[in-house]
Structure formats: C-alpha cells, structure tokens
C-alpha cells in the first residue's frame, strides 16, 4: 500500500493506493481524504492488524480482495445527533465501499477489539446516558450479540444527578457551551445553590472553528466521573459548572484578547445561570488544572465574581515560558505586553 500527499499543510490531499508487487505499474485507489474535509464527511482511516512478525500491517480480508476503514461519523447538530463510529469494507480492485457496521443512534458503541481477519466478529464497548459502559461480543455474520463484562456504576448518586447543557452568548455575540450538574436531590424551584466552576480555556480563530470542535460532543456518552472531576461536590450541595471558555482572535494573536475574553466568558455564564435561578451568584468558587489553574488565578485577579479558587499545578508567570506556550507562538520579546498581562 502506497500513501501519497498532494499539496502542503492542512489542505494536503492524502491518497492510498494498493499496488501488486508483481505488477507495480498497476495501482488501485482505495482511499482519498482532502485535508480540508469537513468533520462530518471524514471517510475514516485504514484499519490495521498484527502481522506475522508482530508488526502492524494493513488489515486485508482472508481472500485478499478487501481492506477496511474505521472512523466516526459526526453531524452538524451534536445536541440532536450523537457521533456514530463505523467500519467500512472497501474492494481493492474497484474502490467500492460497503458499510458493515455502525454504532446505533441512541447509544454510543465503539470497536475495542477485532476478533477475526474479516471483521465479522468484534468486541464492542457500549454505553448510553443511563447505560454504564460494558463490553459486548458482536458477530456480524450470525447476528449474535452477547454481553461479556458486567461492570456497575460505583457512583450512581453522582452520575444520576440532574444535568443541563446550553449555549450562552457573550456581549460580543460569541456563543459557547456550558454544562451544569445540579446537587443531588435538587429540584426546580428549590433555592439556588452555591456553585463550583471548573474550566480549561482553549484558543480559537473564530466562531466557526469553535463550532467545528463542538461537533465532537457525544450526547450518548455515560456521564464520566474521573479522579479530577469536581462532580463529587454535588453530594455536598454544590452545583458544578463546566463552561467552555473560548479565547478568540486571529491565528497567532488569540491571546491579545485573553483577559477580555476570560472575563466576558465567565460573566456571560454567571448571568445566564443566575437568570435560570440554578446558581447563587454570591457564592461561587472557581478551579482548574494546569492551564485551567493558570486561568483560575487570572480570573481571581481580573474579575470580581469568585469567593475562592483552586489552582492545581499551574504556571502563573508567563515570563518563565518565554519561548511560547499553549497556542501562543510569539516569543516573549515579540509580545511582551501579552506575556506580562497574562502573568497575575
């Protein structure tokens, strides 16, 4: 299999051709992907398997006539349509493609292990908003579907807490997502609870680039609860607020707007949650890890919104990273004012 790239940078077109070693002048196009392809049109990537020498080789069918592509289909509106992983079979001689498996639209399934060479039997991870992740043996030839693991939710109080997800609009018109997990036992009409914000700002060129990334949201995922999650606070009467915090500007100059966008993001979220009467804006905390910790300290210094902050493992003096940081590619000597203003 031969890979070719036409063009340069992010817009390069990648093609993969099958070549018979006994007829090297004869090629078959099995895959083509434009660098600027929309996320919703991504054709996937070649599937691989372990070769006879233990290395990774392209997965071909038993008779050698087909290869396989795996990927995830995304949709324009992720709040309506969840991502759906898939597997395609491609005939080498003609390039004809057949979809042999795809995740359901009401739960999230992903291929964990392929059991046989022809991808007729596989182990699939399956989860849903109320379905705890487990593994299933799926046989596409016989239709057999058998559960093989029986894991149970260890924190049902937390994962079962009421959640809300919606868009907020900044004064400049930029829209972003916020997710809120309400305290255990809280019901609409109850007094607004105190809230803990947990965030990690990211940089974007514009609204379109933010929206493109937001399309990967998976509404069919089981609510995750990791070791760094603040959601355990819902058991203590707090709402946990996880806002996107987009820092927006021209490529290479996003941080010119860092303080402005940080303040406006948080203000827009607080105003909207206060309007919905699901937080007490007089009792707010803020926290984050790494760049989220750095941004927590900046928010504590540059905004009046929070009574306390938790900053874990951050770098709070950008002059100590003079050769760039995060998406900032200018050196300290090229953007001195930005580096200093972002060093609380």
List the model feature ranges, each with a label.
Residues 3-24, 35-42, 48-52, 71-86, ...:
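A flexible loop/linker signature enriched in serine peptidases of the S9 family
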Residues 9, 59-60, 69, 74-80, ...:
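C-terminal substrate/ligand-recognition segments
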Residues 36, 154, 202-205, 316-317:
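Active-site/binding-pocket entry motifs
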Residues 43-64, 113-117, 225:
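Signature of short aromatic-glycine-proline-rich micro-motifs recurring in repeat-based ectodomains
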